[in-house]
Amino acid sequence: MRRAIKKITQAVSPPQAAPVAASAGAAASAPTSTTSVAACSAVAAVSGTASAPASGGASERATNATVDEVATKVKKDVNKTIDDVKMTPFLRKITFFSSGGSFLDGYVLAIIGVALTQITPLFALDTMWSAAVGASVFLGIFFGTILGGWLTDLVGRRAMFIIDVVAIGVFSVLSVFAADPLQLVLARFAIGLFVGADYPIATSLIAEFTPKAHRSISMGAVSAAWYLGATAAAFVGFALVGIEDGWKWMLGSAVVPCIILLIGRHDIPESPLWLQSKGKFAEARAVMDRVFGEDIEIHEDEQPTKTSLGFLFKAGYFKRIIYLGILTLCQVVPMYAIYTFGPDIMSAFGLSEGRMSILGESAVSLFFLIGTIPAMFWLNSLGRRPLLIGSLFFMAVGLVILGIFPDAPIWVVIIAFGLYAFFSGGPGILQWLYPNELFPTHVRASAVGISISISRIGTIISTYGTPIFLENFGVGPTMLVAAGLVILGLVLSVMMAPETRGQSLQESSMLN
């Protein structure tokens, strides 16, 4: 197809056009120029229609007009890029299995909250050790996102895409054999390290393979997968909490999704945008031909560029990094605290301890999951910025109600939690979508990693401090602190949130 297009372009180019006969009689009797015939033949070959040679000045002008129209169409086709294609089953597969790392994150985080109901009395954990077990995974995520993002930009998306899932499965099995709190903390830290590495890997792959019209939906799948993993963990925990040594089955069960992910990820190729950014043009072209077809071109301005973290500290990009880090912190700190210590928080609101408190957490998990579904589409219809600001407002309202009325009836508690959880859908997607849209290919994974790592500083502190704060101040003040964080994110977003709807990755990553 590209060779046929080249022939058409050469045929209609002015320098090669044959001169028109000087006299009217010659023009009337002479056949159409060889060039025009060649152009029409090439056009016919591509379009599947036949064109007969024309004669005469009027026919010549008509032919030239037709060729000009075809040339314009051909030029448009030549410039067709990833953003112009439709979603295919293979692109959906990339989204599905790339989202699996997010599923694992939600699963391993939420399952520990349920497992702690058995681990705490078994290992005689005090508040400090319980907090350490909960926070250790976030410390691992903090280092994993930074290191994983840098390595992903340096050595590629695909290599890290496989390694991290294997490691998560191995350390999940090892955590089953923990004989004391320290071993459990170390195993959880290692799991967090590789879960954190998967954030920049998977979301970069999705962003670089997905057309812009579908990007918010594909990133929405990442966010939905997190909530789906957390919801699945809550129900698995609910089923196993009454079994002797159920905590071992809970922690070891993470190996099942790891195996499924390995099977699904084995044939997903390297990102063509990353390959081109490293000067590997032939490999990039081969991936494009395999995934999109020979007629689709890579973005023209993706030029070979050396990966450098210093690039992110340029004035404009540094501002974006700080904003995204704080925004994500304000969004995820309350959510992670709720998931990690969900049963304790539910008990504090009056849901009886044990299985009923776990069931209450499961209901809240469903609200989180349901909220991502309309948000996927609202991000395109309403835009990124309006949805973010509106969602943060309603999230704050839900937490303020919980903080002011901690002794409210259970139905009020569930509705307030539901309000907070449902509207977390938009910001939950944007924590993945914004970093991938606002930074260029050669530092995209690094930017995702750094912005996520900034937020994880807050999650480490909050996860360690939540049980201590709950014990000393109660659930009402705890919820008000969470509301304050969401309000901070709201104020910053009013001041700084960009609008990237409908833009290509090249357009959205440019500094204004």
Residue ranges with predicted function:
Residues 1-22, 26-30, 34-36, 40, ...:
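Transmembrane-helix signature of 12-pass secondary carriers
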